[in-house]
C-alpha cells in the first residue's frame, strides 16, 4: 500500500492522511510555493463577473 502519491510535493502531506470529517486549518491548505497561489486561490467571490 502506497501512502503518498507521486504528486505529494503539490500539497501538504497531511491532506492524504486526513480522517474524514477532521478540520484542516487554511494554513495547511495553502501551497508552499507562491507560484501556485494564483491558480489555487481563485475564489468565485473575488473574481469579477463575466458580464462586466
Curated annotation (Swiss-Prot):
Keyword Nucleotide-binding in the entry? The reply is: no
Q: Specify whether Transmembrane is a keyword of the entry.
A: no
Pfam families for this protein = Crystallin
Q: Please state which protein family the record places this protein in.
A: Belongs to the small heat shock protein (HSP20) family.
Q: What is this protein called?
A: Alpha-crystallin B chain
What does the record note on quaternary structure?
Homodimer. Aggregates with homologous proteins, including alpha-A-crystallin and the small heat shock protein HSPB1, to form large heteromeric complexes.
Signal sequence span is none
Record's function text: May contribute to the transparency and refractive index of the lens.
Instruction: Tell me a Gene Ontology molecular-function term this record carries.
Output: protein homodimerization activity
Q: Keywords on this record?
A: Eye lens protein
Gene that encodes the chain:
CRYAB
Source organism per UniProt = Turdus merula
Spell out the coiled coil positions from the record.
none
